[in-house]
């Protein structure tokens, strides 16, 4: 199972939000490339980058920071989300060498767009599904919809998405541990990989996720825990690799 460090971008800086609130951001670094280097040096094999301004404005705002990381680490796969609402944006990111584009809110508002994107860029599209008590939330978590997360996940699987990034939003950025049951239920219902996000705080969470890797959980995104120190990234990835072999 891949442990994937998150670099959330706001106004050109690396930050973490609590519960998706733009005015509740902790700034961790103004040097994005140095932050990426820190995780690469600790053994990261992929980066998860989110353009937070882009997510709220509906178009890329921090693309330059993504491109700088891409240039500094040409062999490192990057997955990017936030503000991806049209095929042109996806094309620009992929041409720059980004590996995966993550469609979030637009996937729920306009599911046809996911099918279009998968057709145009097969193998490069992921969907980010945020859910609270099994129901999908959108618009920076401001709105909980009446869409069931498993039903939508199946639809996107049929469209050809590469993976689903699943966040239990009751827990993200709050250091409460992972919602194993909800993550497992989604993974078991689908055949494509699930990347767990939200609530990973320590090595125990990695141990818990490792028990459902066989159900289709291929990765876990970690943010606040590695920035605030409750999880050592290098130890976390080493443990994950060890448990994957077991």
Swiss-Prot record:
InterPro entries registered for this protein in UniProt: Aldolase_TIM, His_biosynth, HisA_bact_arch, Isoase_HisA-like, Isoase_HisA-like_bact, Malate_DH_AS, RibuloseP-bd_barrel
One Gene Ontology cellular component annotation held by this UniProt entry: cytoplasm
EC number: 5.3.1.16
Residues of the active site: 8 (proton acceptor), 130 (proton donor)
Swiss-Prot/TrEMBL catalytic activity: 1-(5-phospho-beta-D-ribosyl)-5-[(5-phospho-beta-D-ribosylamino)methylideneamino]imidazole-4-carboxamide = 5-[(5-phospho-1-deoxy-D-ribulos-1-ylimino)methylamino]-1-(5-phospho-beta-D-ribosyl)imidazole-4-carboxamide
Presence of keyword Magnesium: no
Compartment(s) where it occurs, according to its Swiss-Prot or TrEMBL record: Cytoplasm
GO MF term list: 1-(5-phosphoribosyl)-5-[(5-phosphoribosylamino)methylideneamino]imidazole-4-carboxamide isomerase activity; malate dehydrogenase activity
Keywords linked to the UniProt accession: Amino-acid biosynthesis, Cytoplasm, Histidine biosynthesis, Isomerase
UniProt entry tagged with the keyword Amino-acid biosynthesis: yes
Pathway terms, separated by semicolons: Amino-acid biosynthesis; L-histidine biosynthesis; L-histidine from 5-phospho-alpha-D-ribose 1-diphosphate: step 4/9
Gene Ontology biological process terms, A to Z: L-histidine biosynthetic process; L-tryptophan biosynthetic process; malate metabolic process
Entry-linked Pfam families: His_biosynth
Family recorded in the similarity comment: Belongs to the HisA/HisF family.
Protein name per its UniProtKB record: 1-(5-phosphoribosyl)-5-[(5-phosphoribosylamino)methylideneamino] imidazole-4-carboxamide isomerase
Organism: Hydrogenovibrio crunogenus (strain DSM 25203 / XCL-2) (Thiomicrospira crunogena)
Taxonomic lineage from the root: Bacteria, Pseudomonadati, Pseudomonadota, Gammaproteobacteria, Thiotrichales
């Amino acid at each position: 199972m891949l442990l994937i460090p998150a670099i959330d971008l706001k106004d050109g800086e690396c930050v973490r939000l609590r519960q998706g609130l733009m005015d509740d951001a902790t700034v961790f670094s103004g040097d994005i490339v140095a932050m990426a280097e820190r995780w690469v040096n600790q053994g990261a094999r992929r980066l998860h980058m989110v353009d937070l301004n882009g997510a709220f404005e509906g178009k890329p705002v921090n693309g330059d920071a993504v491109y700088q990381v891409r240039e500094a680490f040409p062999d490192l796969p990057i997955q990017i989300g936030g503000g991806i609402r049209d095929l042109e944006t996806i094309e620009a990111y992929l041409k720059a060498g980004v590996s995966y584009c993550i469609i979030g809110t637009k996937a729920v508002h306009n599911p046809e767009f996911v099918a279009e994107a998968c057709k145009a860029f097969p193998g490069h599209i992921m969907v980010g599904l945020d859910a609270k008590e099994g129901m999908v939330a959108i618009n920076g978590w401001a709105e909980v919809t009446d869409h069931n997360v498993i039903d939508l996940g199946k639809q996107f699987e049929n469209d050809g998405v590469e993976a689903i990034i699943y966040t239990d939003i009751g827990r993200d950025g709050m250091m409460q541990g992972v919602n194993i049951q909800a993550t497992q239920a989604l993974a078991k219902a689908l055949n494509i990989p699930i990347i767990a996000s939200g609530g990973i705080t320590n090595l125990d969470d990695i141990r818990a996720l490792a028990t459902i890797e066989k159900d289709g959980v291929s990765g876990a995104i970690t943010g606040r825990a590695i920035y605030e120190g409750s999880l050592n990234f290098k130890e976390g990835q080493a443990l994950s690799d060890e448990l994957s072999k077991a």
